[in-house]
């Protein structure tokens, strides 16, 4: 079976990752001891994508938990599903990265990375046919960003033909807990552009807006934000975990979603976003789901898709519904908003349907968009980066760990290149075709 090895790094990565395992264990009816209590073959049919089966019919997550300080991992271990993880797969240091990318990537993290790779090897060897890796981390801190990207490049070296997929939480000025976030994020993006196949950009700002506006929560906690992230991660991985009509694996997803290797940063979305109390009262219709799913307010990245164009889109519908209706609605959206889809990739919308809805909902939809509007997110980080870097503010924390200013300059220009590549494809052919049409019309008049 096609297995995935899951890695969670740093405080944010471990919190999101921990939540992800709670949600999918729940969907597959696996309790906190790893025992299956469900009654549906569908739940077990592809269980080994994410779980190893141990003696005594225990299911153990194929997860590796990494951090440079023990705190967060202790709280995962003492949490509701803490006992389900394999004890050997907790790998942690004592020093912490102090929100410093250089510590995570070059000094503290580099010392721990070999023991993580040993566990990665052990998990990979136990796989029948490994399809790839997924990493949950944030880009604003030190461990998830610095050590996370170090792990990615090391794993890439050792498994060059396996898919590397990340769920990356991008920092935002509205929800900031460190002043050096723009540095850490830019240095990380520099790595992600080169070394991952698919990156889901999750943005705290967007998550806060959803909690405020849509869910009407007055004081959203990180718990509420992580709840949204885990719903999205569960949706995105549905096709990998359940048999469906369109059986996706990580590679098929990449083939459908990534038209140019560097442009693999996706904007996730989820529907229905209803406050936790009111969701049972009425089931949404397929048109409503489709409408909501494409709505800018439902995007987990703080970018407005109406400011750009979609290169590719994947939608995953969950629940019992008519395939025909889903296809009609998806076509309907594309036809009505055709200017927001690039015309030089025909049929750039792919849809999958899975019969099993998430807990507590009759049906749901998850959205994955590769939109040129994601450049807004990189621009935002880049502006903050430049503001500080121009004055060399805080730079001594990084050079003190042996980094060179040159690396900052390279990362900055790589990110700016990424932005202009998105811009280039956003404008592609629309203008050229426009000029071309006029010539033709001119020819027609004669």
From Swiss-Prot:
Its cofactor is Mg(2+). Disulfide bonds: none annotated. Tubulin is the major constituent of microtubules, a cylinder consisting of laterally associated linear protofilaments composed of alpha- and beta-tubulin heterodimers. Microtubules grow by the addition of GTP-tubulin dimers to the microtubule end, where a stabilizing cap forms. Below the cap, tubulin dimers are in GDP-bound state, owing to GTPase activity of alpha-tubulin. The gene is betaTub85D. One of its GO terms (molecular function) is GTPase activity. It comes from Drosophila erecta. It is found in: Cytoplasm, Cytoskeleton. GO terms for biological process: microtubule-based process; salivary gland morphogenesis. Belongs to the tubulin family. Dimer of alpha and beta chains. A typical microtubule is a hollow water-filled tube with an outer diameter of 25 nm and an inner diameter of 15 nM. Alpha-beta heterodimers associate head-to-tail to form protofilaments running lengthwise along the microtubule wall with the beta-tubulin subunit facing the microtubule plus end conferring a structural polarity. Microtubules usually have 13 protofilaments but different protofilament numbers can be found in some organisms and specialized cells. Pfam families: Tubulin, Tubulin_C. This is Tubulin beta-2 chain. It comes from the Eukaryota. SUPFAM superfamilies: Tubulin C-terminal domain-like, Tubulin nucleotide-binding domain-like. Residues 429-446 have a biased composition (Acidic residues). Gene3D superfamilies: Helix hairpin bin, Tubulin/FtsZ, C-terminal domain, Tubulin/FtsZ, GTPase domain. Mg(2+) binds at residue 69. GTP binds at residues 11, 69, 138, 142-144, 204, 226.
